[in-house]
From Swiss-Prot:
This is ATP synthase subunit delta. Keywords: ATP synthesis, Cell inner membrane, Cell membrane, CF(1), Hydrogen ion transport, Ion transport, Membrane, Transport. GO terms for cellular component: plasma membrane; proton-transporting ATP synthase complex. It comes from Rickettsia massiliae (strain Mtu5). It is a peripheral membrane protein. F-type ATPases have 2 components, F(1) - the catalytic core - and F(0) - the membrane proton channel. F(1) has five subunits: alpha(3), beta(3), gamma(1), delta(1), epsilon(1). F(0) has three main subunits: a(1), b(2) and c(10-14). The alpha and beta chains form an alternating ring which encloses part of the gamma chain. F(1) is attached to F(0) by a central stalk formed by the gamma and epsilon chains, while a peripheral stalk is formed by the delta and b chains.
Length: 184
């Protein structure tokens, strides 16, 4: 089984478990919070991701963490399953896949917008409204910054890429110039 399917399977299992009690949003908040704690804390991350650390010690750590931050039994059992199956290092990817499932269940499309500089709130709202009008669907926009695009924006969703950046335009011009046959 490839890693993408494995991650998706874990996310779907967690999502389906959450659907039983209609707590998909609550589970997302909890699993995102846990992921942030693990990601932000080097010692916890190394402890949980290390193949050298005994699984029983990891299980005890997850149980202690669950007790201290008061997470649901569903999330606690899910984390224990990841520990038992040596999949804790995949947690961030599982959270991303769960997020996608959550938005799909609400008929909301996740769209990534990349700009060279931080966009002002008015600009973000304007871009969001244009994208929602084009897609005829509600969206969750993830705004990212990549100074290498020089200017403009790049829009990504599903398998689509719309490049309105200066870098993209320059690359298209360069490619076009390379195809021109100039006789000497």
């Amino acid at each position: 089984m490839n890693k993408g399917n494995l991650i998706e399977n874990y996310a779907v299992a967690l999502f389906n478990n959450a659907m039983v009690d209609n707590i998909q949003d609550k589970i997302f908040e909890e699993i995102t919070s846990i992921n942030r704690i693990i990601t932000d804390n080097f010692d916890i991350r190394e402890f949980l991701f290390s193949p050298i650390v005994n699984k029983n010690d990891k299980i005890n750590a997850v149980n202690l963490l669950a007790k201290n931050i008061k997470i649901s039994t569903i999330v606690q059992n899910f984390l224990l399953l990841l520990v038992k199956n040596s999949r804790t290092a995949s947690l961030s990817n599982i959270v991303d896949a769960y997020n996608t499932l959550l938005y799909e269940s609400k008929n909301i499309k996740i769209v990534q917008v990349i700009s060279a500089n931080k966009l002002q709130p008015k600009e973000q709202e304007w871009i969001k409204s244009l994208i929602e009008k084009e897609l005829n669907q509600k969206t969750e926009i993830l705004f990212d910054i990549d100074s290498t695009i020089i200017g403009g924006i790049v829009i990504k969703y599903d398998s689509m890429l719309q490049d309105y950046s200066i870098k993209g335009s320059l690359e298209k011009i360069t490619k076009a110039l390379k195809t021109v046959n100039v006789a000497a």
